[in-house]
A protein has these predicted regions:
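Catalytic, metal-anchored helix/loop core of enzyme active sites in primary metabolism
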Residues: 37
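A generic, well-ordered mixed alpha/beta core segment in the N-terminal half of proteins
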Residues: 41-106
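Mid-sequence acidic-hydrophobic segments that form the walls
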Residues: 25, 66-77, 118, 147-151
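Translation machinery proteins
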Residues: 8-34, 89-94
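Short, small-residue-biased leader/transition segments that mark boundaries at the very start
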Residues: 1-4
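Short, glycine/acidic-enriched capping/hinge loops at junctions between secondary-structure elements
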Residues: 32-33, 46-48, 55-58, 126-128, ...
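A structural signal for small-residue-enriched, beta-sheet-centric alpha/beta enzyme cores
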Residues: 79-271
C-alpha cells in the first residue's frame, strides 16, 4: 500500500522507523487475522445499487446484521454510543447506524458496496462550511489547509484527504465522504479539479506532519476531490479524512450474487 511507498521515499531516521513499525503492524494484522488498529471505527457503507438488483429491499437489514456478526467474530471494538442516552450498544449498531449512503442506478441489476471504518482520530478533522463566492478556489485551499494544520496531527497521518465542493454544507459533506471511497492515486475526471488535488497534496505535504504527526516529508497519501455544480452565490466545501491504514473495502455483486472484491485480493466471496 501507500505506507510502503512512503517508507521507501522517506530519508529521515525517525519517520523511517515509524513507517517500518506501520508496515510490521500491517503484516501482523494479516498473519494473525486481526484488525490493524484497536479503533475499528464506526461502520459506514456507500451503496451504488441498480433498481433491479434482487436484494435491494433487504440490503440495509443485511448490512446491519453483518456488522453485528463482525463485531463478535472479528472482533470489533464497541463503537456505537446512543446520543443523549449515552450508553454503548456493544453491537456497533444503533439509531441510524451503520450509516448507509445510497446511489440508485435505474434499469441496472448490479450492486457495488463500499465499506469504510471511520475511526475517531481520522474523523476529528472533518468540517463543512459555505464560503462567499468571492473566496473562490483560494478560499477552498485556505479552508483545507487550516483544517490540516489544526487537526491533521491527531488523525494518524499520512492521511487520505477527501474534499467536497458543491452548494451547501450537506452536499459538500457527502461528496467529501464519497471522495474517500476512491482509490489512492486516482484523479478527478475534471482536469482543473485534478490539478487542485495535486496542488493541495503538495501544500499539505509541505506542512511536514510525517507519520503519526512526528515530522517527515509526507503528510498525506493523496487528496481526492469530488464536486458538483453549485449555486452562483455560494461555495460549499467540506473535508473528510482517512488515516494511514485507511480501512476501505469494495465489493461488486451481479444479479446472481456472484461477488468480486477488488480491494482485498486474498478474499474469495464465492467460496
Amino acid at each position: 500500500g501507500d505506507v510502503y511507498k512512503r517508507q521507501a521515499q522517506e530519508t529521515a531516521p525517525l519517520p523511517k522507523v515509524l513507517y517500518e513499525t506501520m508496515t510490521k503492524n500491517q503484516g501482523l494484522a494479516v498473519s494473525l487475522d486481526r484488525p490493524s488498529c484497536q479503533d475499528t471505527g464506526v461502520l459506514q457503507f456507500w451503496v451504488k445499487c441498480g433498481t433491479n438488483f434482487p436484494l435491494i429491499n433487504e440490503l440495509e437489514g443485511l448490512l446491519k446484521e453483518a456488522v453485528v456478526q463482525a463485531t463478535f467474530a472479528t472482533p470489533l471494538r464497541h463503537n456505537s454510543v446512543e446520543t443523549f442516552d449515552e450508553y454503548n450498544t456493544k453491537r456497533n449498531v444503533g439509531k441510524g447506524t451503520p450509516t448507509v449512503f445510497w446511489d440508485i442506478v435505474p434499469n441496472d441489476d448490479h450492486c457495488e458496496i463500499y465499506s469504510y471504518m471511520a475511526g475517531g482520530g481520522c474523523t476529528l478533522p472533518g468540517k463543512a462550511m459555505v464560503l462567499m463566492p468571492g473566496a473562490g478556489y483560494e478560499g477552498i485551499t485556505d479552508f483545507v489547509l487550516d483544517q490540516m494544520t489544526s487537526y491533521g496531527l491527531n488523525a494518524c497521518p499520512p492521511l487520505l484527504v477527501g474534499v467536497g465542493v458543491a452548494t451547501s454544507v450537506e452536499t459538500a459533506a457527502l461528496l467529501s465522504k464519497k471522495a474517500l471511497m476512491r482509490p489512492i492515486g486516482s484523479h478527478n475526471e475534471n482536469e482543473n479539479a485534478a490539478k487542485m488535488e495535486k496542488l493541495l497534496e503538495d501544500g499539505i505535504n509541505a506542512i511536514g506532519l510525517g507519520p503519526q504527526g512526528m515530522g517527515g516529508k509526507f503528510s498525506v497519501m493523496g487528496v481526492n476531490i469530488e464536486n458538483t455544480a453549485r449555486h452562483p452565490s455560494t461555495i460549499g466545501v467540506a473535508v473528510n479524512v482517512g488515516c494511514w491504514s485507511h480501512r476501505r473495502g469494495h465489493v461488486i455483486f451481479d444479479k446472481d450474487l456472484n461477488a468480486v472484491c477488488d480491494t482485498h485480493s486474498t478474499i474469495d466471496l464465492n467460496a
